[in-house]
Swiss-Prot record:
Residues 243-479 form the Helicase C-terminal domain. SUPFAM superfamilies: P-loop containing nucleoside triphosphate hydrolases. The gene is DBP9. One of its GO terms (molecular function) is RNA binding. Its main location: nucleus. This is ATP-dependent RNA helicase DBP9. A motif (DEAD box) lies at residues 180-183. Residues 351-368 have a biased composition (Acidic residues). It catalyses: ATP + H2O = ADP + phosphate + H(+). ATP-binding RNA helicase involved in the biogenesis of 60S ribosomal subunits and is required for the normal formation of 25S and 5.8S rRNAs. Residues 335-383, 576-612 are annotated as: Disordered. A motif (Q motif) lies at residues 23-51.
Length: 612
């Protein structure tokens, strides 16, 4: 007989009053195979959103749930859907039909949901089949997958409507519709797709909307798909960010690079870190800069193949990489409209008002980003997103290298750390208005409004009972590193950034093909594929990787030199480098005195001339 243990692992009697009513996964009447999978995944008890939503979904009601990031919303809708499919298979084992359609705004989130389905159905894999339509396969392969009628379909709205219009995706037997991250779906440009899907989905389908916020976009989706839904406004959402220590540093534009170098080289931040920058060029500039000091990092942006992006996140969660530089460029390239914009799908999106239940935050809390001088067409995938939805695990620090343009985006960024009751740190680098534009090579347009955005962020966090504290560095100790930062930053030219950007895209395209083909058959070799290799700017200065002892702060020496720091070579050997280079050039046919191929004349005509 199993004993019920409380949170302190102390056995509780059955008639212990209110504690006996505490919900567990067993009390939710889930299939034993699902319970076994939950135990394998180390799920001890349901979170608030799971305890409230699962019984409602099992009873057949439409649900609109607001819960914070990392609260377990994915399991809250997947478990009851899997339960209903298993019950259907018990009644009719041979029946095949598409029972659930799960819509997500990004490919990364689709892959995450697909992995969750596989995990939860690990002990009933023969009965549960799922398909991810966002994977880049040929149309013929996708039609073959859909023709087999998998039980669960995960897709973006665009892919779903394409397959529906081509009759590849049959929704006639659909019983469940899920819209995950519902507040983002319309702001990613899927409004027309959602309206078309609303016409294609049969009546009576149970609809579940999951969202971190309740915005007017969620209300629009509720009107399209739901029938008198039960609205869950969980109080647990009030605790979002409670375990995050928030700091801000005011610095010049080039000092952002200096502070970042000092933070990671002196190990002022322990653990994994996500660095948010404004656009893709900034991500490669920062990566090349850190490479000068031997600091490895991964770049995550919309230009990389989706397989590579997913693999980077997976390896980061496993602890293979410690630093991710994420290009959160949605606001910079014009995808978030200006105030007063009449765009239907975005007028109340990222810069939009929130209803009264969202603590009274409104458009006045957002700062409009400066207009771009050159309106270039964006090459960014609309189904890419990094600051929302993706399940980054055990992130110790979020570094806002470039401050976002809205207080809401700031909240979503720092939500990558301090998840599941853990603590975290968020550090933002702020450029004062009087220092903006002083250093042209590192200047960034959105930094012009940093102080105004910071004021709104402080105001919003204060309403939540939290504080953004100033982070004070010892300027005298930091100035000692300034000349090294200047040398490294000078080497990272615009040409070097473009070359690195092109090189990594080509390499990741190759890696992406390998991920799809070769590594499916050789999973052990997948570990050899790394995304944090050096991109090599035009001028490499090996001495910058070593920090001289005289630059080390007194308090930091013990921590960094307690162990063997190893041999630091400066590429100097006992060989004569000039003689070695001369021999190498002679072998390449670049001239020389002994037997060079095409290296000039074999004999001096003046020396062979004889006069009598």
């Amino acid at each position: 007989m199993k004993r019920k243990l409380d949170e302190n692992n102390v056995p509780t009697p059955e008639n212990s009053g209110p504690k006996a009513l505490e919900k567990t996964f067993e009390t939710l009447h889930l299939d034993p195979r699902l319970l076994q999978a939950l135990t394998k995944q180390k799920f001890t008890k349901p979170t608030l959103v799971q305890a409230e939503a699962i019984p409602l979904v099992l009873s057949g009601k439409d649900v609109l749930a607001r819960a914070k990031t990392g609260s377990g919303k994915t399991a809250a809708y997947l478990l009851p859907i899997l339960q209903s499919i298993l019950q259907k298979k018990i009644a009719n084992p041979t029946q095949k039909s598409i029972s659930a359609l799960i819509l997500v705004p990004t490919r990364e989130l689709a892959e995450q949901v697909q992995n969750a389905v596989v995990s939860f159905s690990s002990f009933c894999g023969k009965d549960i089949r799922s398909a991810n339509l966002t994977q880049k396969v040929s149309d013929a392969v996708q039609r073959a997958i859909l023709a087999d009628l998998p039980d669960i379909i995960i897709s973006t709205p665009a892919r779903a409507i394409i397959n529906t219009n081509s009759s590849s995706l049959s929704l006639n037997d659909l019983t469940h519709l899920v819209i995950d991250e519902a507040d983002l779906v319309l702001s990613y440009g899927y409004e027309q797709d959602m309206q078309n899907l609303a016409k294609a989905i049969p009546r009576g389908v149970q609809t579940l909307l999951m969202s971190a916020t309740l915005t007017s976009e969620v209300d629009a989706l509720k009107g399209l798909f739901c029938r008198s839904p039960v609205i869950l406004k969980l109080e647990e959402a009030e605790d979002e960010g409670a375990g995050i220590a928030q700091f801000a540093v005011k610095c010049a534009e080039d000092e952002k690079f200096l502070l970042t170098y000092v933070i990671f080289k002196l190990q002022l931040v322990k653990g994994k870190c996500i660095i948010f920058v404004g656009d893709i060029d900034r991500s490669y500039r920062l990566k090349l800069f850190l490479e000068q000091f031997g600091i490895k990092s991964c770049v995550l942006n919309s230009e990389l193949p989706v397989n590579s992006r997913i693999h980077v996140v997976q390896e980061f969660n496993k602890g293979v990489y410690d630093i991710i530089i994420a290009a959160d460029d949605q606001e910079v390239i014009g995808e978030i409209p200006k105030k007063g914009s009449k765009t239907p799908e975005q007028s109340n999106g990222e810069n939009g008002d929130e209803p009264e239940e969202e603590k009274g935050f409104s458009d006045e809390d957002e700062v409009e980003p400066p207009p771009s001088k050159k309106r270039k067409k964006s090459t960014k995938e609309k189904d890419y997103g990094i600051s929302r939805g993706i399940d980054f695990q055990d992130v110790a620090c979020v570094l806002n290298f470039d401050l976002p343009t809205t207080a809401k985006s700031y909240t979503h960024r720092i939500g990558r750390t301090g998840r599941a009751g853990k603590t975290g740190m968020a550090l933002s680098l702020i450029v004062p208005s009087e220092l903006y534009g002083r250093h042209k090579p590192t200047s960034f347009p959105t930094a012009k409004n940093d102080e105004a955005v910071l004021a709104k962020i402080i105001k919003r966090q204060a309403k939540l009972g939290r504080e953004v504290k100033p982070y004070n560095f010892d300027t005298k100790q930091i100035d000692a590193f300034r000349y090294r930062m200047t040398d490294a930053l000078r080497a990272v030219t615009r040409v070097a950034v473009q070359e690195a950007r092109t090189k990594e895209i080509k390499q990741e395209l190759l890696n992406s093909e390998k991920l799809k083909r070769h590594f499916e058959e050789n999973p052990e070799e997948l570990r050899q594929l790394r995304h944090d290799g050096e991109l090599r700017p035009t001028r490499v200065q090996a001495h910058l990787k070593h920090v001289p002892e005289y630059l080390m702060p007194a308090k930091g020496k013990a921590g960094l030199t307690s162990g063997d720091i190893g041999f630091v070579g400066l590429r100097k050997t006992n060989e004569n480098r000039i003689r070695k280079a001369r021999d190498r050039n002679r072998m390449r046919g670049k001239g020389g005195r002994k037997g060079g191929r095409g290296g000039g004349r074999k004999a001096d005509p003046l020396k062979t001339f004889k006069s009598k």
